[in-house]
């Protein structure tokens, strides 16, 4: 339902549909787009390993870009699927960097994970002169604390195995009670839990923590 009309038109007109898929599983983004695909479109699967090292992930994008390039050279229109927005921490950026100098690439904006999580939490992000920060959970504790203290609203992404560290930082600065945790936003298995009730030190890939300095946006 959150596919834009523009993206839908491009998807349905494409000769080829390319998308990332984990090396050991099914593609979430394809499952979202599947009801809107014609059924006779060619597909390019970009098998992406979830690794912290830059390589071999970059090799995968080299191969994916080469397959897309071959399809374009054959006169075919290619649509590349991406969860959320392609330029907001999206893997599409790596394909764009490889293809945009040689071909006309149209980037269609999408609904970001930040917007989706904010809406599902019924938590406005900013008003007036508020500063909003997007903070990767991969930061060290000192850097994360500094970013949190400098923001009216902070969205912590890439929670994953960094959950324990993130909780420690939020507790240290007295923000744990104002932190809103959500995983798999807008999906059927969406889950919203108070941060204090989260056990363990890891979270799913699709998870986010949003925290406001003053709790509510209208109390300023």
PLM region spans:
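Class I S-adenosyl-L-methionine
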Residues: 1, 5-103, 192-193, 199, ...
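General beta-strand structural signal in soluble alpha/beta enzymes
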Residues: 19, 45-46, 80-82, 107-110, ...
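Cofactor-binding loop segments of dinucleotide-utilizing enzymes, especially the Rossmann-like FAD-
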Residues: 22, 83, 137, 159, ...
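A generic local secondary-structure boundary/capping motif
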Residues: 7-8, 69, 122, 143-146, ...
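A contiguous loop/helix-start segment that scaffolds small-molecule binding in enzyme catalytic cores
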Residues: 148-220
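Short gly/pro/ser/thr-enriched loop/turn and capping motifs at secondary-structure boundaries
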Residues: 24-26, 51, 112-115, 163-164, ...
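Class I SAM-dependent methyltransferase SAM-binding "motif I" and its flanking Rossmann-like core
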Residues: 83-150, 200, 213-217
């Amino acid at each position: 339902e959150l596919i834009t009309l523009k993206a839908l038109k491009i998807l349905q007109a494409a000769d080829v549909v390319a998308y990332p898929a984990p090396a050991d599983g099914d593609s979430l983004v394809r499952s979202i787009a599947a009801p809107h695909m014609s059924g006779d479109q060619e597909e390019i699967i970009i098998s992406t390993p979830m690794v912290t090292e830059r390589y071999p992930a970059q090799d995968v994008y080299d191969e994916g870009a080469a397959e897309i390039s071959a399809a374009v050279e054959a006169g075919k229109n290619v649509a590349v699927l991406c969860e959320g927005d392609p330029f907001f921490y999206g893997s599409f950026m790596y394909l764009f960097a490889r293809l945009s100098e040689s071909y006309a690439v149209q980037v269609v904006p999408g609904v970001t994970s930040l917007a989706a999580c904010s809406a599902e939490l019924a938590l406005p992000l900013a008003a007036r002169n508020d500063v909003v920060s997007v903070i990767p959970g991969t930061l060290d504790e000192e850097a994360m604390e500094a970013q949190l203290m400098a923001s009216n609203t902070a969205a912590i992404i890439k929670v994953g195995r960094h959950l324990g560290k993130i909780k420690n930082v939020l507790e240290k600065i007295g923000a744990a009670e104002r932190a809103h945790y959500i995983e798999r936003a807008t999906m059927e298995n969406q889950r919203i839990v108070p941060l204090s009730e989260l056990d363990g030190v890891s979270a799913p890939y699709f998870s986010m923590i949003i925290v406001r300095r003053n709790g509510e946006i209208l109390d300023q």
